[in-house]
Structures are given as structure tokens and as C-alpha cells.
Amino acid sequence: MARDTGILADSAIASLFDDGRLLSEGPLDEDQIQPASLDLRLGARAFRVRASFMPGPGHLVADKLDRLKLHVIDLSEGAVLETGCVYIVPLMESLDLPAAMSASANPKSSTGRLDIFTRVITDRAQEFDKIPAGYRGPLYLEISPRTFPVIVRRGSRLSQIRFRIGHALLTESEVLDLHRTDTLVASDTPNVSGAGIALSIDLKGTGADGLIGYRGKHHTAVVDVDRKNAHGIYDFWEPLYSRGADELILDPDEFYILVSREAVHVPPLFAAEMTPFDPLVGEFRVHYAGFFDPGFGHAQSGGTGSRAVLEVRSHEVPFILEHGQIVGRLVYEHMMERPKGLYGLGVGSNYQAQGLKLSKHFRG
């Protein structure tokens, strides 16, 4: 039964295109619409800019680009985006949202696992990755590779957008009720606070060697964001193993791929998102890619609960991360209706039933 409020499912996203509410420079890719989101595609040009910026009320992104751009890069045949630089790319998709519909954006999971910092910008924006109700205009993506230089091209998909009507967030009591019926995390006593389920870090390791994660290497070759299984793991990553202490010292400005201790489940009538980490709890950032689609870890779509892969970066000081330490919270929202496709069932999902897993670009 459909709801009046909630996150739009795949069929409703397709209807936005049919109704002219979602516009694109070209036909959609076959797998571009996901169960609860739409992948956004890069346009044909990238603007290298001096610094990131917020347009602010009354200002267009294009006007800011005229003042801040250093040079323009043609993406039609592919181009390298260097680490430490900031780029603004007009996206192929634009919006003409109904008055009651808003949207939010997030990096795709493979983007976060490459440590590519991205956020969507709109004209007159006062927040990144937030599209106000009734917005009409273009979309832009800010891109800043942090660890690896990357090759992108027109049509590359680094970010995704979710559409919602009204308030869809589950309350703390609703999350607990849902956990009792659908087991959201593999725990008899989930830590639920502020409507979010706590996720903690696993530093005991997996397999005979006790692998706990990976640390990104510096001064590597480029990663082509559109090529799967194209790169060797050890050319880009240093494996990290448990040494018995069940802790890991995060070095400043290093990038880590780790995994949650809990297995996560998102039932088909709900979507989830990893909330930004509370800086009062620790001096590090966890998880660029926050969207979890309906069906993530769901038994009917090939999962038995999937652990959340975490992108972790320390800030100004070294920080000791300990096994079982809470590193983020997963909040749940209602879908307006059940998606036709679920995560893991033929919708381009690369990480169903995952444990510790690097992005799809790496072999092994």
C-alpha cells in the first residue's frame, strides 16, 4: 500500500522523467535508476576552480564559475582529475521538482571507497547535497580526489540522488519496533539513540590472517572510475591485519577501508542512510557514501545481513580506534511504496552480502 509521504521508489523516479520533472541531456542508462535513488551522470566539461564554494541565496553556480575557474577540461574522451584539486562538473540531469518534493544527494558507494570527495550543488544553495522542495534548475557536482587520481568522462556516475515527499524518518520507537519484526542489525540489544541504530567497528579481523582493513597508498597510478576489476589491490592498498590488540591508530590524512561489526538489514519498504559522524565522539570522519537501498542485506535478494563497509579518515591528530567503538548511526526512512527492484536483484548492485570489500575497480 502506497504512502503519502516517504522516499520515492524506482517506478516513481521513472515517472518523474515521463512527467518532465527530471530532465536529462540524453537517454537514461539502463541501470541508472536504483531501488530508491537515481545515479547522476557527469556532463561534458569540468571546471578546475581555485577553491570550493557555496553559491548562497541569489547566486547562480555559473556566475561563481566565471569568477573562480582556472581552466576548463573536456571530458568527452575522458580526463584525469588530480588529487588535491577541486573541480565543478555540470551534470547531465536537471530538475523541475513539484512544490512538495525535495531531494538529497550522496556519493555512490564505489566513489566513497575511492576516497573521491563529492557533493552536489544547486543554484542559490545554502547547503551541499540538499535540493529544496520545488527546485527548478541545473545540478553540479563538486569533485575532489583525495587519495588516487582518477579518470572520468561524460556519463561517469559518481553521485546519486534520492527524492522525498514530506517527513519520512522513523522515530526511535518505530526503529525498535521494526527491529523486533525484521532484525535490522544482528544484535539482541541494538543501540538506538536519536532514531538511529549505532554501528561499531570490527578490528578483530576476518579469515586466517586476521585482515581488518586497507590503507590507501600515495603516488599511485590513476583509477578509471568506469572500469571494473581493472586494477590490482596491492598497487593501491596496504592490507592491515589484527596484531592481537584489537585497535588501530589512525594517522592524520590517511584513508582507511574498514568494516562494521554488525550485519545490516534494510527491509524492502524502507531505505536507510549513514548519518554524519558526531565530532564530539571522535576525531575522525566515517563513511562518505551514506545511502543504503531497500533490500540491502535482505534474504530475498541474496543477503543474510550485510556488514557496512566504512570509509574512515582521521583529522588533525592521530586517533586510536578500538574494536566495538561506535563509528556512526544508521537512520531509516519509509518508502512511499515497495520498489520493483531490490538491492542485489539485477539492479547493478555490486556489494550485496558483503564483508570487508574494496570498490568494484579492484581485482580479488
Residue ranges of model-derived segments:
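DUTPase catalytic domain/fold
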Residues: 1-364
